[in-house]
Design a protein with these regions (language model features):
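Active-site phosphate-binding strand-loop segment of PLP-dependent enzymes
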Residues: 1-35
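Conserved PLP-binding catalytic core of the aspartate aminotransferase-like
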Residues: 124-177
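Short, electropositive alpha-helical surface patch
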Residues: 14-16, 43-56
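Active-site-proximal structural scaffolding
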Residues: 8, 19, 39-42, 52, ...
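Amphipathic alpha-helical segments in well-structured domains
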Residues: 12, 42-46, 90, 140
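Alpha-helical subdomain
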Residues: 5, 34-43, 95-102
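Conserved core segment of the aminotransferase class I/II
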Residues: 51-126
Length: 178
């Protein structure tokens, strides 16, 4: 999320309730899973939607978390109510896919699949991802320290409380020019 502000589990529960009450179909974008609090923690929202017995889409990108930017590696998962519905959805997805591309590149997908299905490689990848996550946190702390040194007044803790690669700074133009 480009603001760095993630919903709390309580806020997600409210979103789930609205989706359920209104009969909506949610689309969850997991482009930065693992950069916030960890792979499982960042993906916990999926469990909330599953527990509510909802139908929804999950778009997962591996371009950032695997540093495969040029490969554009990702997946679309669709949670359906039963196998008949899944078959109908798959049929429609195949039509959409066929009109967009016939043979997508496979190198990046093979790299991701190999890492995720090889326990030693997966553990190493998760360790590296944790290192990236900690570096982002350290950079946020350094930014706040530099802003304080530059004389920026006011509350800045929200910058270190935000997660991931993006941050909504809330700084004015004058503060940015310091």
């Amino acid at each position: 999320n480009p603001t760095g502000c993630d919903l709390t589990p309580t806020q997600w529960a409210q979103v789930v309730q609205v989706v359920k009450t209104r009969g909506l179909v949610a689309f969850l974008d997991m482009a930065y899973q693992g950069f916030g609090d960890g792979i499982a923690q960042d993906g916990a929202v999926i469990g909330q939607f599953l527990a509510a017995d909802l139908r929804f889409f999950v778009s997962t990108s591996f371009s950032k978390s695997f540093s495969l930017y040029g490969e554009r590696v990702g997946a679309l998962s669709v949670v359906c109510g039963d196998s008949d519905e899944a078959a109908r959805v798959l049929s429609q997805l195949k039509i959409v896919i066929r009109t967009n591309y016939s043979n997508p590149p496979t190198f990046g997908a093979q790299v991701v699949a190999t890492v995720l299905t090889t326990p030693g490689l997966r553990a190493l990848w998760e360790q590296d991802l944790g290192g990236m996550r900690e570096r982002i946190r350290a950079m946020r702390q350094a930014l706040v320290a530099k802003l304080r040194t530059a004389g920026v007044q006011g509350e800045l803790d929200y910058i270190t409380e935000q997660k991931g690669m993006f941050s909504y700074s809330g700084l004015s133009k004058a503060q940015m020019l310091r």
